[in-house]
Amino acid sequence: MRLTQMPSEFQKALPVLEKIKEAGFEAYFVGGSVRDALLHNPIHDVDIATSSYPEETKQIFPRTADIGIEHGTVLVLDGDEEYEVTTFRTEDVYVDYRRPSAVSFVRSLEEDLKRRDFTVNAFALDETGEIVDLFHGLEDLEKQVLRAVGVASERFNEDALRIMRGFRFQASLGFALEPETFKAMKTLTPLLENISVERTFVEFDKLLLAPFWRRGLASMIESQAYDYLPDMASSQDKLNRLFDLETDFTFESSEQAWAALLWALEIENAQSFLKSWKTSRQFAKQVQDLLIILALRENGELSKRDCYRFDIDLLLQAENLRQAQGKEVNPQAITEKYQSLTIHDKKEIQINGGILIKEYGYQPGPDLGEILTEIEFAIVDGELENNREAIHAYLREKK
């Protein structure tokens, strides 16, 4: 099969392929970018595979960087663009179900494609637009099926993260998992305990943000993979609560998705749960803030202080999630209340601790912090104007 029109992302990278071929080697576009081109989906990263060994690749191009040369990858700098060029390779026995004990460079495209995870990710595309399809991936693409390359159990034993990737691809593409592939995934889910939490988080996060997240999550639940994820053992019934969200609902952000997950799981200690997933502090705080906003909304409308406390984006994401839960919402009222605030950050207050110490005799400590907070909330509540005259008058009254 030949692409009738080469996507612009590939056209831009063609000079790299052509230079490698002029040097006497093979070179192809590979991986998800080829799949996305065939599906007419947006193309993100353009990856190139070649028969040239890393040192040979570096001799072809004047500007390169070693980013994973032990695995055969050289970063080629072509004008303003950067491309990862990786040597065809085979992999030895995998250690800990996550990484090969050794990588061997080869000259064979077929040997390289054999080690890919799913047939729809095992395409190669040459400079003429010709598709190399050694594992009937085009047929699977047509049937919208996710099938492991070769023997499914071998692929998942090599790298157990591929199990989570299978659920994630199902969520992003909306494809069905081929029965033997899914059977192997279900059998080998205990291997997920060998995968780093960080890698698992990335795949689970992508699953939740995907347009067909319900399909991916349903397969994950059916496989009982959750039993091998941090703090999620025996959580099937609670995970199913996510399916109570509106049918066509998709998450706006990772923070919103994980807030929904914690809501579904009825997690009492969000901080501990997110720590077990090794998320960043900033991410954990935003997820917890969303949960706090949701709890506040359960008790009625948000106050001015509530709107001041949180970023408007989080306030609206919480409202969006409430709507998906089938609850009453009023995003316009929240936006108007937020916009009506005199200040949105205490740094905007027209007085500071230094002035209070110098002009009013306050000493650093709890009393100073207390009066500053009092001024801050008086301004937020609309009881005090945010200008020096008004604040000084307020302070004189306090004295």
Swiss-Prot record:
- Protein residues bound to Mg(2+): 45, 47
- GO MF entry, a single one: ATP binding
Q: Which UniProt keywords apply?
A: ATP-binding, Magnesium, Metal-binding, Nucleotide-binding, Nucleotidyltransferase, RNA repair, RNA-binding, Transferase, tRNA processing
Tell me which EC number(s) this protein carries.
2.7.7.72
What is one process in the GO biological process aspect for this record? Answer: RNA repair
Does this UniProt record's set of keywords contain Ribosomal protein? no
CDD domains per the UniProt record, alphabetical:
NT_ClassII-CCAase (cd05398)
List the InterPro entries: Bact_CCA-adding_enz_type3_sf, CCA-adding_enz_C, CCA-adding_enz_firmicutes, NT_sf, PolA_pol_head_dom, PolyA_RNA-bd
- The signal sequence is none
Q: Which Pfam families match?
A: PolyA_pol (PF01743), PolyA_pol_RNAbd (PF12627), tRNA_NucTran2_2 (PF13735)
Does the record carry Transcription regulation as a key word? no
User: Which cofactors?
Assistant: Mg(2+)
Binding of ATP: at which residues? 32, 35, 116, 159, 162, 165, 168
State where CTP binds: 32, 35, 116, 159, 162, 165, 168
Report quaternary structure and partners.
Homodimer.
What does the protein in this record do?
Catalyzes the addition and repair of the essential 3'-terminal CCA sequence in tRNAs without using a nucleic acid template. Adds these three nucleotides in the order of C, C, and A to the tRNA nucleotide-73, using CTP and ATP as substrates and producing inorganic pyrophosphate. tRNA 3'-terminal CCA addition is required both for tRNA processing and repair. Also involved in tRNA surveillance by mediating tandem CCA addition to generate a CCACCA at the 3' terminus of unstable tRNAs. While stable tRNAs receive only 3'-terminal CCA, unstable tRNAs are marked with CCACCA and rapidly degraded.
UniProt miscellaneous comment: A single active site specifically recognizes both ATP and CTP and is responsible for their addition.
Q: Which PANTHER family match?
A: CCA TRNA NUCLEOTIDYLTRANSFERASE 1, MITOCHONDRIAL
Q: Which family does it belong to?
A: Belongs to the tRNA nucleotidyltransferase/poly(A) polymerase family. Bacterial CCA-adding enzyme type 3 subfamily.
| Record protein name field | CCA-adding enzyme
Naturally occurring in which organism (per UniProt): Streptococcus pneumoniae serotype 19F (strain G54)
Record lineage: Bacteria, Bacillati, Bacillota, Bacilli, Lactobacillales
